[in-house]
């Protein structure tokens, strides 16, 4: 692995401290700790407390997970319990596979 790993910047938009919000955050933290130890920054945004941020980022439903960096911006809306779908949906799994293939050559 390259010593210069990229950092993933993610935003999780939730609506208060509801069971769905708590579950989404727990599942996401689990995925990130397993797959991206130390190479991610996660900001949790409560759209009830910060509706202007949700409006600026065009968030229509919660929970919504947005990958901000590296580009392109990708979003997943709803259930975050399927690890593989989250990684593929955000292009995170694809990036890791591509990097491993490049290292093997």
From Swiss-Prot:
One of its GO terms (biological process) is circadian rhythm. The keyword Calcium does not apply. Disruption phenotype: A triple kaiA-kaiB1-kaiC1 deletion grows normally under photoautotrophic conditions in continuous light. In a light/dark regime has strongly restricted viability and impaired growth behavior, and overall decreased pigments (after 5-6 days); phenotype is more extreme when grown on 0.2% glucose. One of its GO terms (molecular function) is identical protein binding. InterPro entries: Circ_KaiB, KaiB-like, KaiB_domain, Thioredoxin-like_sf. SMART domains: KaiB (SM01248). Keywords: Biological rhythms. Gene3D superfamilies: Glutaredoxin. Pfam families: KaiB. It comes from the Bacteria. Belongs to the KaiB family. Key component of the KaiABC oscillator complex, which constitutes the main circadian regulator in cyanobacteria. Complex composition changes during the circadian cycle to control KaiC phosphorylation. KaiA stimulates KaiC autophosphorylation, while KaiB sequesters KaiA, leading to KaiC autodephosphorylation. Phospho-Ser-431 KaiC accumulation triggers binding of KaiB to form the KaiB(6):KaiC(6) complex, leading to changes in output regulators CikA and SasA. KaiB switches to a thioredoxin-like fold (KaiB(fs)) when bound to KaiC. Homotetramer in solution and crystals formed by 2 dimers. Only elutes as a homotetramer in size exclusion chromatography, interacts with KaiC1 and KaiC3. The KaiABC complex composition changes during the circadian cycle to control KaiC phosphorylation. Complexes KaiC(6), KaiA(2-4):KaiC(6), KaiB(6):KaiC(6) and KaiC(6):KaiB(6):KaiA(12) are among the most important forms, many form cooperatively. Undergoes a major conformational rearrangment; in the free state forms homotetramers as a dimer of dimers. When bound to the CI domain of KaiC switches to a monomeric thioredoxin-fold (KaiB(fs)). NCBIfam families: circ_KaiB (TIGR02654), PRK09301.1 (NF006798). Has 2 forms, fold switches to a thioredoxin-like fold (KaiB(fs)) when bound to KaiC. This is Circadian clock oscillator protein KaiB1. The lineage of its organism: Bacteria, Bacillati, Cyanobacteriota, Cyanophyceae, Synechococcales. The gene is kaiB1.
């Amino acid at each position: 692995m390259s010593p210069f790993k990229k950092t993933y910047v993610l935003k999780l938009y939730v609506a208060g401290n509801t069971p769905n919000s708590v579950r989404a955050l727990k599942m996401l933290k689990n995925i990130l700790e397993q797959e991206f130890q130390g190479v991610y920054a996660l900001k949790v945004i409560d759209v009830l407390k910060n509706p202007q941020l949700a409006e600026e980022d065009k968030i229509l439903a919660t929970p919504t997970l947005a990958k901000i960096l590296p580009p392109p911006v990708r979003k997943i809306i709803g259930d975050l319990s399927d690890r593989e779908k989250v990684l593929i949906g955000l292009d995170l799994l694809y990036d890791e596979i591509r990097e491993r293939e490049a290292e093997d050559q």
